[in-house]
């Protein structure tokens, strides 16, 4: 059997705000008076998943199952903000920022992608002896080169004891008894920003900085330091159980 599923979403936002000379509530700290601001944002995301399964038997006693999965996810967010202070006319609000005495423009784009492959193999003999092995290969865009991809295997064994011939005498009061054990590795990429592995640089303008007696109007400084060693968080798990 084969199944495919595609989901997506689009988003758009626009907001304009004007603070007159007598309005100070929630006005940005860097803003003069009067002050106007316009904000625009666009976003989209989609996920595409595919599942392919195949089951077959040999001599009615040996049952096999193979399942393959792929998943692709992409998210993108873009924004543009523009500010202006010192407009001559209130009626201009945020529609004529070029007429402001000072302007400020900010924009940004954040894009992330995730890709996953998974393969699972099941085998059972007469429904009594069960074996499962699976492996996931996950990749994300926001880890450093060489650490974007990792593998997460898992396996399990089970024995349906109640189907054995020596359990016939107890089937009236114990008709289901299964022992199982499993182990595997799981991965976690949550909590990491889209560009956390990169060092950010910013331009500082303000009134300039003096270096060796000279005013440098535009300077660049380092923001958040990136961590190129960031990679997948792994958890090693095992379990044992008795089902009755």
Where are these regions (language model features)?
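Extracellular/periplasmic, surface-exposed regions of secreted and cell-surface proteins
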Residues: 1-19, 31-244
